[in-house]
């Protein structure tokens, strides 16, 4: 890593810590319902209108049912908006209704906080669908994840042991998280982004004349959207020459803010945060990276306050940060080393005062390797999926690092809420392993970890690897899945593995060489996204209910401390061993083989 890369990483982590600590205090207050009187008075009409008693606790089953019903309604709403787009207002380009399979995939994607996009936003979605459908779900899906994290924190903090298993009120949680956390933060960030040059308007697209003609290759596809290939298996293209360019417009800044703060990641434009209208300057790039990690980091501090020991939250955050720093160093080093194939032709990969060096393919020159690699690690450590560079153009090992960060279960900071509850599931497993080693009934934060909790923990951990590996196997075996692979060999397999990894872990980024906007991939990835999201949330809520029903025991002489460096090391080891071991064979077939082949040339 270069000196600038180390400096950027240090600046990023320092500012993140300064911002996350006070936000953690606010999140803890929202979780506990300790809000100023005027906030309660402002909420009251909403609760009366909906017939909700916010002070009434819910059993975990009722909480889960409310959550599932709420998100299922969200899928129907977003799907309907897309299918009716042709007759809706605020569509200055007259974009038609979205195809059924793509609309289904997109609806599930945004409701599940994945924001996988098989479509190009500027040529598919009108302004009303972007605002009323996609942006609204950016708020609500993030609020859902934070609500689940709150429920699990309450399960650990509960002291009564009355057997009721109440974990809070889902409707009150959604209202408070959205109104008092996400909306204010998004407003501030949106104003900042607009001031830096991110566009915010409702005008029609602008056609402008270019200084000189542009010649490019347009990939050809059949009626089903599959890439056409020649006899050698190479994609067919046609040469296009033009002297005009269409500049897309739209209300971007308002959507960009919650896209990052909610760890959603779905771009207004196809190029996502590589587009200058979404992410114009290095300063906005830094702000967007900070926004991605802000809520996940603050939730760690909030968790410590809710359970009554701030050190517990710091230990969780320390484990996340340790793994994140290692990942940043790995991906930056891989990209800075460059492409051996180009080095063999005489290209100089060494960074100097006159060049960035390394592998600049697919990266914006205004960001360079350091900011692009850091952004890639941030967006895949969190379940965000926004990109400011094309991950498909990374070196084999550089592209493997984002994939591994997702395969760990999106617990290295992770998504808004999902990162914390995912890491707490691994913490339960870690104390169980420690209990086996010393022959004691494991405890975590005063709650005994027994058979029921371990069964639910196993389900929560194994859901996503099962979806990823089975889904990848189906895709590479099915003719419809094979047809979408444009790149042959190991990289083509990596593209499929990345897609299923991203979908099942609710990340949303992609190796964009895969033609995924087809009925086969739209349905397959939608199923992976839905069950990857709610197949984990339901067992986590069940764990929360089980813990809430138990008495909280005081620490004894044999209780394992869970706030020191030993526990942090054990937690990191557990995440790496259990979270990553499932994927070693598939990684060996994809990026590892590709790296070895590249080095051998």
Swiss-Prot record:
The chain crosses the membrane at residues 3-23, 62-82, 132-152, 179-199, 283-303, 314-334, 367-387, 397-417, 419-439, 459-479, 523-543, 564-584. It comes from Paracidovorax citrulli (strain AAC00-1) (Acidovorax citrulli). PANTHER family: POTASSIUM-TRANSPORTING ATPASE A CHAIN (PTHR30607), POTASSIUM-TRANSPORTING ATPASE POTASSIUM-BINDING SUBUNIT (PTHR30607:SF2). GO terms for molecular function: P-type potassium transmembrane transporter activity; potassium ion binding. The keyword Isomerase does not apply. Its main location: membrane. The lineage of its organism: Bacteria, Pseudomonadati, Pseudomonadota, Betaproteobacteria, Burkholderiales. Keywords: Cell inner membrane, Cell membrane, Ion transport, Membrane, Potassium, Potassium transport, Transmembrane, Transmembrane helix, Transport. The system is composed of three essential subunits: KdpA, KdpB and KdpC. Belongs to the KdpA family. The keyword Transport applies. This is Potassium-transporting ATPase potassium-binding subunit. HAMAP family: KdpA. It holds the Pfam family KdpA.
